[in-house]
A protein has these predicted regions:
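Amphipathic alpha-helical binding modules
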Residues: 73-131
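Residues within HEAT/ARM-like alpha-solenoid scaffolds
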Residues: 44, 66-69, 103
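Short, solvent-exposed, charged loop/turn and helix-capping segments
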Residues: 51-68
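Intrinsically disordered or highly flexible coil/loop and linker segments, enriched in small
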Residues: 25-29, 62, 121
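Generic structural signal for hydrophobic core residues of well-folded globular domains
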Residues: 20, 38, 53-57, 75, ...
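Amphipathic alpha-helical interaction segments
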Residues: 48, 69-73
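Short terminal alpha-helical segments
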Residues: 1-50
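Alpha-helical rod/repeat scaffolding segments in eukaryotic adaptors/tethers
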Residues: 32-39, 60, 64, 94, ...
Length: 131
């Protein structure tokens, strides 16, 4: 049973990493705009990507800064979308009216960076224990 869960978690990680590495647009979040415009936005994908942070650190695999940055971008935008009950026009508003979103995004940034910092510290700590 434990082995099946580990294999399932590893599959989630591999899928998440593959999605990120195969889609350079994720870095800038532009693919979210395309998905929203085509009404194909699927929050489950982003939930899996975010879950992969904890799974990767659980299995003592170092998380690259670039991966953390990409996951941060995804989480930031998905949280904005969830907070606004997701309207495709919100993506345009975020770009065209940054002052309107600035305070809200700052709160999200603080929470997300705390999460990322915590995960990075876990990875560093696990790495030292294994050495």
């Amino acid at each position: 049973m434990k082995r099946l869960k580990k294999e399932k978690d590893q599959c989630i990680v591999n899928n998440a990493l593959q999605v990120i590495s195969n889609n350079e647009q994720l870095e800038e979040g532009s693919c979210l705009y395309v998905l929203a415009y085509e009404e194909r936005f699927d929050l489950r994908l982003f939930d899996e990507l975010m879950h992969s942070i904890s799974v990767v650190s659980t299995y003592n695999k170092p998380i690259g800064v670039q991966l953390l940055y990409q996951l941060y971008i995804i989480q930031r935008i998905s949280l904005v979308l969830m907070a606004s009950h997701f309207n495709p026009e919100d993506l345009y508003c975020i770009e065209s009216e940054p002052e309107h979103w600035k305070e809200h995004l700052q709160e999200l940034d603080d929470a997300i960076f705390a999460c990322i910092k915590g995960q990075a510290l876990k990875v560093i700590t696990y790495g030292k224990e294994g050495a």
